[in-house]
Every structure is written in C-alpha cells, then in structure tokens.
C-alpha cells in the first residue's frame, strides 16, 4: 500500500491536468517561398439584422443565430430551418457548436421559391424537425423531406 504524505505548505491552484492555457488564434495561411499569394482579403461579416440571411424574409420577431464553437453567434435567421440550412453550408468554414439538423439548398435552386418559404413559415415554431433535400438529376426536381419524432 502507498504511504500517504501531507504537504501543508504546498498549494495547487491550477493543476496541469485541469488547467488548459488559452491558445491564440491559429495562423490563417503559411505559404512556402515557392508559392505566391494571389489574394489576402479580410472582410467584416454581413451587418444586415432585419432580414433572414437564408430566405431574405423580414425579421418581425427575435432572430435566431448560428452558435459558434467558442460561444459566439453569427447570422440572423427567421427559423431553425433557415439557420440549420445555412449552417450546413458553412460548417467547413465556421466552427459550429452543434451539427445542423436540417439541410436545404439555397433558394436560388428552386423554381417555386414561395413553396419553400411557405414550408419554412409553416414549420417555423415546430421543435424536433430534421431532414434534408434531395436533388433528382434526371428529372431536375428537388425533394424536400423534413420529419419529426414529436
């Protein structure tokens, strides 16, 4: 059996197993000398707060945002469908807190945009909705399949 040792003068305020130093932001791009940078631009995010970033409808109530991995928020959306649809498009560029549950194509894909907007408005207040859309190449049709377990 191990012998217990008491050290009254030692204070452990932040043990290495618990304390993780805050890392600075990673460098965006490091190129070897034989590459030449063709574009290096920094642009602020969209500042529009009165329209949904996905369906462009007016926001008449408190907007929903995409939650980032570090606790921040980005975007303004009228519904969870719009938020998750845009989040599924940008998840390779923005570190998200959680995986999106819904994935629709951008409205530019649809011939009848009003049908998609009506679906968004119909399901705006529903919880537990998940699903996606499927593009049928032969018939040039997009099937939207949204489901709920509730």
From Swiss-Prot:
Gene Ontology terms for molecular function:
zinc ion binding
Membrane-spanning regions, if any? none
Q: Name one Pfam family in it.
A: Pox_TAA1
Which keywords, in A-to-Z order, does the entry hold?
A: Activator, Late protein, Transcription, Transcription regulation
Question: What does this gene product do?
Answer: Acts with RNA polymerase to initiate transcription from late gene promoters.
What family is it from?
Belongs to the orthopoxvirus VLTF-2/OPG126 family.
What subunit structure does UniProt give?
Answer: Interacts with itself. Interacts with the late transcription factors VLTF-1/OPG093.
The protein depicted here goes by the name Viral late gene transcription factor 2
From the broadest rank down, the organism's phylogenetic lineage runs: Viruses, Varidnaviria, Bamfordvirae, Nucleocytoviricota, Pokkesviricetes
């Amino acid at each position: 059996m191990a012998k217990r040792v008491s050290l009254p003068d030692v204070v452990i305020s932040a043990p290495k197993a618990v304390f993780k130093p805050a890392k600075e932001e990673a460098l965006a791009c490091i190129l070897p000398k034989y590459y030449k940078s063709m574009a290096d631009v920094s642009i602020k995010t969209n500042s529009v707060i009165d329209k949904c970033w996905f369906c462009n409808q007016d926001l008449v109530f408190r907007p929903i945002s995409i939650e980032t991995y570090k606790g921040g928020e980005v975007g303004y959306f009228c519904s969870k469908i719009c938020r998750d649809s845009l989040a599924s498009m940008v998840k390779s560029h923005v570190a998200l807190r959680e995986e999106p549950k819904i994935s629709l194509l951008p409205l530019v894909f649809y011939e009848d945009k009003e049908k998609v907007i009506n679906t968004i408005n119909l399901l705006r207040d529903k919880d537990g909705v998940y699903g996606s859309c499927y593009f049928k190449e032969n018939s040039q049709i997009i099937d939207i399949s949204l489901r709920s377990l509730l």
